[in-house]
């Protein structure tokens, strides 16, 4: 389904009752073909969605609420357009469910169907809100660098690495990631963490490259996959993982993770800006 046919940028009608048909899937294939991915994926990973505006009625009509987390596998054929996700979650507000498990099972069934793959769902009830973490991405900050730049469209030629020197292992972070919604043009603000083993990447060039997304239009997942592939091709690391955490919009934040080696799922701890 084409993003232009999604609810983005259109007048909003909020559903009075639960409605799974509100979910609008968008195939990943189109954006991946633009990146040269036409067969096996050169990475694996997950898109972590956090939903902070989920509420429903119990069997007696009393409102209930929870924070929901969805783990969408990167190999799923579809993503879900974010405004449609918001409208879908909003449709729960005046609908009755017998239990928290019933809500979770419904979410898992519907979102898995839209994505075309099994999606894991976690719900955190209010009495466990104190357990939710907040911390910044770990790593050496690239933003400490004082530099000039004037490139605001993705330019992989900014990337380089010391190919003749011994490999290193580094974790680098930046809070200066910005891209833009391809339908509405609204800015998406994010932080990005890059962990790699291989020839040392030039830090100034990497920061300029991250900044170069500032005028780029692309969904969160697509931007992270482009970052991953550009670093992989230009710098040739032996191991690479890219994790971005984008700020919240419409009660949802999206946090894509891509890697080419086995490692634990990153912590789903929201940053201060989230």
Swiss-Prot record:
It catalyses: 7-aminomethyl-7-carbaguanine + 2 NADP(+) = 7-cyano-7-deazaguanine + 2 NADPH + 3 H(+). InterPro entries: GTP-CH-I_C/QueF, NADPH_dep_7-cyano-7-deazaG_red, QueF, QueF_N, QueF_type2. It is an enzyme of class 1 (oxidoreductase). Pathway: tRNA modification; tRNA-queuosine biosynthesis. GO terms for molecular function: preQ1 synthase activity. One of its GO terms (biological process) is queuosine biosynthetic process. It comes from the Bacteria. Belongs to the GTP cyclohydrolase I family. QueF type 2 subfamily. This is NADPH-dependent 7-cyano-7-deazaguanine reductase. The gene is queF.
């Amino acid at each position: 389904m084409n993003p232009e046919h999604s609810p983005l940028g259109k007048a909003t009608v909020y559903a009075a009752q639960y409605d799974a048909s509100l979910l609008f899937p968008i195939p990943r294939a189109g954006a991946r073909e633009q990146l040269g991915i036409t067969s096996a994926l050169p990475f694996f990973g997950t898109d972590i969605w956090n939903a902070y505006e989920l509420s429903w009625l119990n069997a007696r009509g009393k409102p209930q609420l929870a924070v929901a987390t969805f783990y969408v596998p990167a190999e799923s054929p579809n993503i879900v357009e974010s405004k449609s996700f918001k409208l879908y979650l909003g449709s729960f507000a005046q609908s009755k469910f017998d239990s928290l498990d019933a809500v979770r099972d419904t979410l898992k069934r519907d979102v898995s169907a839209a994505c075309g793959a099994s999606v894991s769902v976690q719900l955190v009830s209010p009495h466990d809100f104190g357990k939710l973490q907040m911390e910044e991405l770990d790593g050496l900050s690239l933003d400490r660098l004082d530099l000039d730049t004037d490139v605001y469209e993705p330019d992989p030629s900014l990337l380089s690495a010391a190919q003749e020197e011994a490999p290193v292992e580094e974790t680098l972070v930046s809070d200066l990631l910005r891209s833009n919604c391809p339908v509405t043009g609204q800015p998406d603000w994010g932080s990005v963490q890059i962990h790699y083993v291989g020839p040392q990447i030039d830090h100034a060039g990497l920061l300029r490259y991250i900044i170069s997304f500032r005028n780029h239009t692309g969904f969160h997942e697509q931007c992270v996959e482009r970052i991953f592939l550009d670093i992989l091709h230009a710098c040739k690391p032996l191991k690479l993982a890219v994790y971005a955490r984008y700020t919240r919009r419409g009660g949802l934040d999206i946090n894509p993770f891509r890697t080419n080696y086995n490692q634990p799922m990153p912590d789903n701890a929201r940053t201060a800006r989230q």
